[in-house]
Amino acid sequence: MTFAASVVRTAEGDGFTPPGPHDFDLPAIGGGHDTFEMFGQSFVLGVTKPMLQLVLAAIVLFVFFFAAARKRAMVPSRLQFVGEGFYGFVRNSLGRDIIGHDFAKFVPYLFTLFFFILLNNAFGSIPFIEFPTFSRSGMVYGLAVLSWVIYNAAGISKHGFVGYLKLQTVPGGIRGPILALLIPLEFMSNILVRPVTLALRLFANMFAGHLLLILFALGGEYILTEMSVQYAPVGILAWLMFVAVAFLEMLIQFLQAYVFVLLNAMYISGAVADEH
């Protein structure tokens, strides 16, 4: 949903209609497609704007980093310098420092994941797009499942299935009957719950931030255009809050991409760590 397309026009005397989850249910491009409900979410059988944004993000990132790496030189160009700086940031702070000596083979995934999430988050602040892709929960669950497969596969590859299951479910240094209580809890926490919390954290922040932006923008417009002049200062304040939240949202877009990849690195580190 863009701000231009989501301006709430209410019938005269009906009052202001605040934005809500329904504003994130975008129709299929071209219209005329069926929808169905699952897990409290509306799903469209067709191509939607967030789907196109995923493709656009992949194309933009490929073109940028291909151009940055195409003519590598000892004295880097500005584009190469920026590309290497981006790569070094993920490699060192999210790969080497978190995973340790086995980090190198996971850097391509962490690097791609970080900038893919960051750009899709940033779409919420880019004019004429103005919709963070991961404010739709289904998009985030796809990334979470991919991450779950990768760090579990890494652990099984190193320790074997039984050894990895023991590593994830049996706390080190604990013996006796209490294990009957701890093992199911560890299994739930480390195997089942992680992808859910990983997805919900990113989704909730992108959803809530965008909802606040819409609320301040449309609320301010309604106060200034539909209410008496004595409420004008409130409308102006709402728009000032919109500007402030917009800048805060840019910071959150970066932080949520960083946190998502940081947790991925931590999960991988735990999966490939030596046994207790």
Swiss-Prot record:
GO cellular component: plasma membrane; proton-transporting ATP synthase complex
Keywords: ATP synthesis, Cell membrane, CF(0), Hydrogen ion transport, Ion transport, Membrane, Transmembrane, Transmembrane helix, Transport
Keyword set includes Transport: yes
Compartments (UniProt record): Cell membrane
Annotated CDD domains: ATP-synt_Fo_a_6 (cd00310)
Its job: Key component of the proton channel; it plays a direct role in the translocation of protons across the membrane.
Similarity remark: Belongs to the ATPase A chain family.
Protein name: ATP synthase subunit a
Lineage start: Bacteria, Bacillati, Actinomycetota, Actinomycetes, Propionibacteriales
